[in-house]
């Protein structure tokens, strides 16, 4: 199965759907779904996902290179792995999504969206994770969902972690730093993301990794993400990565800006970078007689997008943690 990406983009079903690799077995589970199981017993399970948004291609290319290294035998596998290319149709079309944003649908939220390929795919992915994590004796569960951002950022690589009732494990956060993430953002409320679903329902240590800016296939400079790729290779092989000399800055979400109607106005232009700082009292958005202002001494914006559909998030406001 050394042509997983090509098969996914073409929508083709392989003639052979399972086989042997270098020290592992593989099974094609469906379009964009590939399970890898080491020959030796392991108690660690890892979801590696990318392409939830079809225009975010750099992580997909990164996973393709990791798979090639595994199949060639130059990389040893020490985890059970489920590789997920989230939205095959949008990936093939080179667009963010075909009908609706899938990363708002998980945890059963797809039921509140108009039925589409994305709602069906979200349900399929939920079932796939359930099956994967239910198989075998699993002591450690991780989920790394690889993305790129729509706009530029003051932090080239950063992670977004879902709301979690338990403390985050230190080795997981340390690995994220070793993977080159310059900042970590901690959600304080539940959401419809893929990583929140895996964390809430399966207790996985989950993170959305944002790696640079969204570009078409073939236009990505993967050398920007070599530290992340090297950390993923080490993780798969069971090799401990060295701790980053500069731990990631930490932020938490303090509010969400939501667009409710066509009267919504977000006072940030297309050049506003992720993690841009705003002083207390700054007017961020208006909608009718409702005004959204900065309430802390300094807040930082993440994912500003005035063009989202009504009812969806138009941005997150963050505060720095000590």
Swiss-Prot record:
Gene3D superfamilies named among the record's database cross-references: Zn peptidases
Keyword Cell wall biogenesis/degradation in annotation: no
Cofactor section: Zn(2+)
GO molecular function annotations of the record: hydrolase activity, acting on ester bonds; succinylglutamate desuccinylase activity; zinc ion binding
Pathway(s) where this gene product acts: Amino-acid degradation; L-arginine degradation via AST pathway; L-glutamate and succinate from L-arginine: step 5/5
GO biological process: arginine catabolic process to glutamate; arginine catabolic process to succinate
Pfam families reported in the protein's UniProt record: AstE_AspA_cat, AstE_AspA_hybrid
Keywords tagged on the record: Arginine metabolism, Hydrolase, Metal-binding, Zinc
Active site: 210
Top EC group: hydrolase
E.C. no: 3.5.1.96
Catalysed reactions, semicolon-separated: N-succinyl-L-glutamate + H2O = L-glutamate + succinate
Details of cofactor binding: Binds 1 zinc ion per subunit.
Top-rank lineage group of the source organism: Bacteria
Binding site for Zn(2+): 53, 56, 147
Functional note: Transforms N(2)-succinylglutamate into succinate and glutamate.
Protein family according to the UniProt entry: Belongs to the AspA/AstE family. Succinylglutamate desuccinylase subfamily.
Protein name: Succinylglutamate desuccinylase
Organism: Salmonella choleraesuis (strain SC-B67)
């Amino acid at each position: 199965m050394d042509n997983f990406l090509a098969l996914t983009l073409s929508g083709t079903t392989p003639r052979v759907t399972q086989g042997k690799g270098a020290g592992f077995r593989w099974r094609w589970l469906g379009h964009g779904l590939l399970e890898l199981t080491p020959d030796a017993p392991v108690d660690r399970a890892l979801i590696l996902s990318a392409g939830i948004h079809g225009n975010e291609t750099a992580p997909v290319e990164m996973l393709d290179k990791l798979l090639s290294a595994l199949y060639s035998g130059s990389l040893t596998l020490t985890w059970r792995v489920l590789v997920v290319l989230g939205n095959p149709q949008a990936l093939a079309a080179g667009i963010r999504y075909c009908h609706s944003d899938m990363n708002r649908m998980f945890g059963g939220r797809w039921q509140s969206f108009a039925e589409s390929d994305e709602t069906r795919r979200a349900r399929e992915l939920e079932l796939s994770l359930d099956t994967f994590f239910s198989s075998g004796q699993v002591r450690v569960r991780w989920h790394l969902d690889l993305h790129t951002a729509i706009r530029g950022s003051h932090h080239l690589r950063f992670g977004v972690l879902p709301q979690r009732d338990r403390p985050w494990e230190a080795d997981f956060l340390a690995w994220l730093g070793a993977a080159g993430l310059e900042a970590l953002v901690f959600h304080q409320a539940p959401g419809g993301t893929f990583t929140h679903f895996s964390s809430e329902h399966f207790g996985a240590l989950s993170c959305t990794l944002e790696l640079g800016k969204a570009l078409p296939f073939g236009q990505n400079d993967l050398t920007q993400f070599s530290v992340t790729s090297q950390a993923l290779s080490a993780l798969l092989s069971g090799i401990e990565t060295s701790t980053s000399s500069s731990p990631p800055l930490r932020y938490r979400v303090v509010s969400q800006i939501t667009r409710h109607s066509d009267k919504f106005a977000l006072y940030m232009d297309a050049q506003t970078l992720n993690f841009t700082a705003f002083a207390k009292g700054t007017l961020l958005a208006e909608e009718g007689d409702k005004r959204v202002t900065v309430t802390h001494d300094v807040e930082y914006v993440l994912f500003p997008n005035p063009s989202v559909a009504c009812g969806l998030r138009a941005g997150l406001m963050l505060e720095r943690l000590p």
